């Protein structure tokens, strides 16, 4: 049995633009005044002056989870007070650091512990 809590299907385009040198860059979300600084740890050729792309990817996972939970809860008439997430992900750095063609550049395991009140 399928339940459609959002009767109208919509498509939204999201965009970003960036400028940078080396592994550091400044990302600007389209239609926003926000600026997202990005850098990498020295092991990846950066200066660690800002969160890494991996940190932002993991932050996006928990942030999207919270936003999605809040939207679905609202549609179902459920009030959610607070969220706490702990996320861990395994990544084989052989591709990123060593250029290995035998390794997988994707997260191998992602675990999320969420506490929702």
Predicted features, each with a name:
Residues 1-59, 69-117:
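Extended beta-strand/beta-hairpin segments
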């Amino acid at each position: 049995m399928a339940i459609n809590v959002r009767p109208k299907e919509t498509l939204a385009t999201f965009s970003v633009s960036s400028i940078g040198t080396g592994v550091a860059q400044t990302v600007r979300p389209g239609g926003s005044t926000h600026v997202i600084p990005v850098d990498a740890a020295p092991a990846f050729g950066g200066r660690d002056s800002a969160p890494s792309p991996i940190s932002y990817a993991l932050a996006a996972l928990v942030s999207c989870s919270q936003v999605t939970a809040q939207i679905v809860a609202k549609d179902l008439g459920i009030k959610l007070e607070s969220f706490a997430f702990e996320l861990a992900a395994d990544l084989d750095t052989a591709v990123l650091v060593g250029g290995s063609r035998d390794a997988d550049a994707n997260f191998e395991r992602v675990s999320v512990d969420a506490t929702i009140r």
